């Protein structure tokens, strides 16, 4: 029984506690325990005020936390009631600086799915069903706190039945901000060549078109997809032709996860519901053109009610690729989709719930390795490593490709969704809108801006235009620091040896790096060695035409290169003009690029087209070719000369070794890993360092990663896992470097 006193307790709960049904959960728990007081949302999380002792309440709070919630901390302090409460209530949300976490969009929960499929339920076959445990979150928020008036759902006044659920603390839709039903909520429309249908008729029109082998644009949670029957080779070929996407792999949505490996099924059925890369053998019904020349395919399960309704009726795999023109950002509005995709889609399945934030599908490997972090994961906050405290607000702009930006403040960082290539005007507009919204949501005003060392980057130009103090960070230092931060390497953890492998990034003194061994801590980066610098004939064209890189390698390392059949792809080109340009240094900058080295080897083995249709195409084909070989004894090495890998020796041995192409592809990966491992071991041993870090886009190569781990098994190895190894994680690395320098007094608090 409560004491007759005005003394109580105030609990400050921080973590992922808004938009997850946390207040109704607290209310219900208080009712069960006969507690008196109140609960509310504010900018700092959830505040609970109790009249009674909170011990039992706290135990059950942790034990029965809602499925989408996460409690990071609970602080308690005495509270004096001006008037003792006689019940437990939910107070109106308040504002304040946003230190709480916003919840990512979540896949349809089992309860809503069952309700949607039950005849007689008022939301039977309703494609926008949701509750506190599932549905859109980040993609519908316009401002904080997370209440319906601050979301796109403000346009849909609740009907009496939904309003009753929304206000009933015992209902799972209590304070579920996206709650809706057929009477008061969003509805479907079908648009196709003058045809128009609504609601169930719209759904059936789309299903009929898909069964006929047509292409349908479908509005989802964070953007549009282009869909077609993934078994129908003609439909897939038509989609590729119309979208100008000849070879880039297409993601596929499966009706069920039957037959997939357990690890893949577990990832597919999480609330994040990402695309998961699995071996093609697990989905034999797909046509050959889904992921040509690769041994993996990206699969996903329905993640929203509309997708469930489609797949339940079709019972076949659907291509679900991003709804955009090639090289352009995916559409998020009906008007944009109808304009951009009219030459691709045969019909449009749209709805009238706006999308505030574009959110692409996240992509992970079966192992859990993150390749693209977006829907379902963003904007989950990331804890900064031990030692990072009271960091001032820092805006980190990332790289120009696979861009994300990062907000750093206090002891947390928030990484944006994948935004893409900043050279595109449409993506620049979406980037600015995403930043504006994130700053609004988190009440974030940066005190300084961090950008990449490349002065020509769009992001570097933006940093200079922001009229704030700026800090420059080397590209590969940021790669290494991002991996350190992911693994919670302490601020005072000391030095590590890092291997950063990618296409190119700006290094010291304007050098172009891409295959580097570094001594790194959060504040410092020392170059120790790596690949030798080789010309990039034609500049940016070298990233699109692998044969150019083979020519550059041959001119540098293979005197008699024209005698080898492996150079046929070069000899078919007008190579002599390029050779003179390289000799004179005309549009042929030097770069120690691991990505371009992969392209050269792929060209030599004939597994790369003359001109690539997507980034990484040659390297992915080379990895797939190598993966078909399960290891081989070979004579190929990359010894070290002055801390650089000796590529002249590699090419001489490799070109003169006669073996099947898959064995030669495997030997390249193995020799490269062995060469880098020996360099890292030598540099670490002489400094007494036992921890090695790996990052950069090339580290996504599973075979290279495995061979590096094999040769360095006696060290502590840190590989990226929950953040992308490539540029998608770069902005976090920029953030922790900037924060470490500020905490050390090297940067003035602007």
Curated annotation (Swiss-Prot):
Q: What Enzyme Commission number(s) appear in the record?
A: 6.2.-.-
> Could you confirm whether the keyword Coiled coil appears in this record?
no
Q: Name one GO molecular function term.
A: zinc ion binding
Span of zinc fingers (C4-type): 109-134, 159-184
Q: Which domain of life is it from?
A: Bacteria
> Which family does this protein fall into?
Belongs to the carbamoyltransferase HypF family.
Task: State the protein's name.
Answer: Carbamoyltransferase HypF
Which species expresses this protein natively? Escherichia coli (strain K12)
């Amino acid at each position: 029984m409560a004491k007759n006193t005005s003394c109580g307790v105030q609990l400050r709960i921080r973590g992922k506690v808004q938009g997850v049904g946390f207040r109704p959960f607290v209310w219900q728990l208080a009712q069960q325990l006969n507690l008196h007081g109140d609960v509310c949302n504010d900018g700092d999380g959830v505040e609970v005020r109790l009249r009674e002792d909170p011990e039992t309440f706290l135990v059950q709070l942790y034990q029965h936390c809602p499925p989408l919630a996460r409690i990071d901390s609970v602080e308690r302090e005495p509270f004096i009631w001006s008037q003792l409460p006689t019940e437990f209530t939910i107070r109106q949300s308040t504002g304040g600086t946003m230190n709480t976490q916003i919840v990512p969009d979540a896949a349809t929960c089992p309860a809503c799915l069952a309700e949607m499929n039950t005849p007689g339920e008022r939301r039977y076959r309703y494609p926008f069903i949701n509750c506190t445990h599932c549905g859109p979150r980040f993609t519908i928020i316009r401002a904080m706190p997370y209440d319906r008036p601050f979301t796109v759902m403000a346009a849909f006044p609740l009907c009496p039945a939904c309003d009753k659920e929304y206000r009933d603390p015992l209902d799972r839709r209590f304070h579920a901000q996206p709650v809706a039903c057929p009477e008061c909520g969003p509805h479907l429309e079908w648009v196709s060549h003058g045809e128009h249908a609504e609601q169930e008729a719209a759904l059936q029109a789309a299903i009929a078109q898909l069964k006929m082998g047509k292409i349908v644009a479908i509005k989802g949670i964070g953007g549009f997809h282009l869909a077609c029957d993934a078994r129908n080779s003609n439909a897939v070929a038509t989609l590729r032709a119309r979208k100008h996407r000849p070879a880039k792999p297409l993601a596929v949505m499966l009706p069920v996860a039957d037959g997939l490996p357990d690890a893949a099924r577990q990832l597919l059925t999480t609330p994040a519901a990402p695309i998961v890369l699995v071996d093609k053998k697990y989905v034999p019904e797909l046509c050959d053109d889904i992921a040509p020349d690769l041994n993996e395919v990206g699969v996903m399960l329905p993640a929203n009610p509309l997708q469930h309704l489609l797949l339940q009726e079709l019972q076949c795999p659907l291509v679900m690729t991003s709804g955009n023109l090639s090289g352009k950002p995916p559409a998020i509005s009906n008007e944009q989709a109808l304009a951009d995709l009219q030459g691709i889609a045969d019909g449009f399945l749209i709805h009238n719930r706006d999308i505030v934030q574009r959110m692409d599908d996240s992509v992970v490997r079966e192992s859990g390795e993150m390749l693209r972090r977006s829907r379902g994961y963003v904007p989950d906050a990331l804890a900064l490593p031990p030692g990072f405290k009271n960091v001032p607000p820092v805006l980190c702009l990332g790289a120009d490709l696979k861009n994300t930006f990062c907000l750093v403040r206090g002891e947390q960082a928030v990484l944006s969704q994948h935004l893409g290539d900043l050279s595109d005007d449409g993506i620049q507009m979406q980037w600015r809108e995403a930043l504006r919204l994130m700053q609004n949501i988190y009440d974030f005003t940066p005190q300084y801006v961090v950008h990449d060392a490349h002065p020509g980057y769009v992001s570097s130009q933006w940093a200079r235009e922001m009229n704030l103090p700026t800090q420059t960070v080397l590209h590969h230092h940021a790669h290494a620091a991002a991996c350190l931060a992911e693994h919670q390497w302490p601020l005072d953890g000391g030095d590590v040896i890092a291997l950063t492998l990618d296409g190119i990034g700006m290094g010291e003194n304007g050098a172009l790096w891409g295959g580097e061994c570094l001594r790194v801590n959060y504040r410092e980066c020392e170059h120790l060695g790596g690949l030798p610098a080789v010309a990039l004939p034609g500049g940016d064209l070298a990233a699109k035409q692998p044969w150019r890189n083979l020519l550059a390698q041959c001119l540098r390392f293979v005197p008699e290169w024209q005698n080898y059949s492996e150079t046929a792809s070069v000899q078919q080109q007008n190579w002599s003009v390029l050779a003179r340009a390289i000799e004179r240094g005309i549009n042929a900058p030097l770069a120690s690029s691991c990505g371009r080295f992969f392209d050269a080897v792929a060209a030599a083995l004939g597994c790369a087209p003359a001109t690539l249709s997507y980034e990484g195409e040659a390297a992915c084909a080379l990895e797939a070719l190598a993966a078909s070989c399960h290891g081989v004894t070979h004579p190929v090495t990359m010894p070290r000369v002055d801390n650089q890998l000796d590529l002249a020796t590699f090419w001489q041995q490799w070109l003169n070794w006669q073996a099947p192409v898959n064995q030669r592809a495997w030997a390249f990966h193995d020799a490269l890993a062995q060469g880098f491992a020996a360099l890292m071991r030598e540099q670490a041993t002489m400094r007494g360092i036992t921890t090695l870090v790996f990052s950069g886009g090339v580290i996504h190569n599973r075979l290279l990663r495995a061979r590096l781990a094999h040769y360095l098994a006696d060290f502590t190895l840190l590989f990226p896992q929950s953040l992308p190894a490539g540029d998608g994680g770069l902005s976090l690395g920029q953030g922790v470097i900037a924060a470490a320098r500020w905490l050390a007094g090297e940067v003035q608090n602007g």
